[in-house]
Curated annotation (Swiss-Prot):
One GO cellular component term: plasma membrane
Organism phylogeny: Bacteria, Pseudomonadati, Pseudomonadota, Alphaproteobacteria, Hyphomicrobiales
UniProt xrefs under Gene3D superfamilies: Glycogen Phosphorylase B (3.40.50.2000)
UniProt-listed Pfam families: Glyco_tran_28_C, Glyco_transf_28
GO molecular function: UDP-N-acetyl-D-glucosamine:N-acetylmuramoyl-L-alanyl-D-glutamyl-meso-2,6-diaminopimelyl-D-alanyl-D-alanine-diphosphoundecaprenol 4-beta-N-acetylglucosaminlytransferase activity; undecaprenyldiphospho-muramoylpentapeptide beta-N-acetylglucosaminyltransferase activity
UniProt entry keywords in alphabetical sequence: Cell cycle, Cell division, Cell inner membrane, Cell membrane, Cell shape, Cell wall biogenesis/degradation, Glycosyltransferase, Membrane, Peptidoglycan synthesis, Transferase
Family: Belongs to the glycosyltransferase 28 family. MurG subfamily.
Binding sites annotated in the UniProt record for UDP-N-acetyl-alpha-D-glucosamine: 13-15, 124, 165, 193, 294
Protein name: UDP-N-acetylglucosamine--N-acetylmuramyl-(pentapeptide) pyrophosphoryl-undecaprenol N-acetylglucosamine transferase
């Protein structure tokens, strides 16, 4: 017999849906029935989502400065609130959990009006706009990197971490082993759909500036946009470097576990996976990210000694070469960075998030939950 119903609200991007999916698996395993509220954009990601039902709900982004567009967005969101309220009345969830993005506004707002217990999960080190709008109304806030401080939001925040994929948990079992002497040095470079262009442009020139001995040690795995793959391969081939370049790697977690150094953007999922697996990283925040969330995520890992943060504007090929070459010649530093990253990894994030969800569903306060976890 099911313990009850939990409604998850996520949408817009797979980045918002992934932690929702991880929580759904955990809650299903505990006997809960899970429903998903999302928008049309995110429905394409939801094909394998472990939910009893998926409920498309209208929403809109509030990004325009055009007053007519703003009014239209408000009207769409309000219609979404009415849709969500009807669904909540029908399925009677014990709690509603949001994962950021504007599609979460209607279901979470409707839930607070109906006095249903509510929780939001923020993946980044700074709150996104939708979660900021909801923070004052919800009962609890779960954070990937958010602080538990004495502010109004901080007092009802529980730092659960960001749930990671099973493949990442498996990769985390591989301890870090520094490359010394003339051993191969495995370098993993990736930037995601928004950031790979910079690495495609900058990395081959930087590798060309390394010493011959250092280039001979390098084994590079680099993610690049499909349009860039051929030219990146050609540039590396001219240097005689062992490299694999592709737009996508299905075994990215295993490749991260095999890496001696990671160079990447600093989205919430990326930083969480680097921390759980425990690998040293040079983080280059995407400079055009909304709310500068990538810079804040990177700073959280750097504060633990797990990585170095380098703004893109400071990274000439000469600077990148100096950073890589210096670390290749300092395995002790790399091992210390790996340990620092591992120290802030949260492999139990899905369990902690499910624990908090159950507590909120049973009408417990965040204060009571924190006391219970510290007992």
């Amino acid at each position: 017999m099911a313990r009850g119903v939990i409604l998850l609200a996520a949408g817009g991007t797979g980045g918002h849906l992934f932690p929702a999916e991880a929580l759904a698996h955990e809650l299903n395993g505990r006997g809960w029935t899970v429903h998903l509220a999302t928008d049309d954009r995110a429905e394409r990601f939801a094909g394998h989502f472990p939910a009893a039902a998926v409920h498309p709900i209208q929403s809109a982004t509030m990004g325009s400065k055009n007053p007519i567009a703003v009014l239209g967005a408000f009207w769409k969101i309000w219609r979404g609130v009415r849709q969500a309220s009807t669904i909540i009345g029908r399925i009677k969830p014990d709690a509603v959990v949001g994962f950021g993005g504007y599609p979460t506004l209607p279901p979470l707002y409707a839930a607070t009006r109906r006095k249903v217990p509510t929780l939001i999960h923020e993946q980044n080190a700074v709150m996104g706009r939708a979660n900021r709008a909801l923070a004052g109304r919800v009962d609890a806030i779960a954070g990937g990197f958010l602080p538990q401080d004495t502010s109004a939001a901080g007092e009802k925040t529980v730092t659960t971490g960001n749930p990671v994929r099973p493949a990442v948990l498996e990769a985390a079992k591989t301890p870090y082993a520094a490359s010394t002497g003339q051993e191969p040095f495995r370098l993993l470079v990736f930037g995601g759909s928004q950031g790979a262009q910079f690495f495609s442009d900058a990395m081959p020139g930087a590798i060309a500036l390394l010493s011959d001995a250092q280039r001979k040690r390098l084994v590079i795995t680099q993610q690049a946009r499909a349009d860039d793959v051929a030219r990146v391969k050609t540039a590396y081939a001219a240097l005689g470097v062992a490299v694999e370049v592709s737009p996508f790697f299905t075994d990215m977690a295993a490749r991260m576990a095999a890496a001696h150094l990671v160079i990447s953007r600093s989205g919430a999922s990326t930083v969480s996976e680097i921390a759980v697996i425990g690998r040293p990283a040079l983080l280059v925040p995407y400079p055009f990210a909304l709310d500068h969330d990538q810079a804040a995520n990177a700073a959280a890992l750097a504060a633990a000694g797990g990585g170095e943060v380098h703004p893109q504007s400071t990274l000439s090929p000469e600077r990148i070469a100096a950073l890589i070459g210096g670390l290749m010649d300092n395995p002790e530093r790399l091992a210390a960075m790996a340990a620092g990253a591992k120290s802030v990894g949260r492999p139990d994030a899905a369990r902690l998030l499910a624990d908090l969800t159950e507590a909120i569903a049973s009408q417990k306060t965040v204060s009571d939950f924190k006391k219970g976890t510290q007992a």
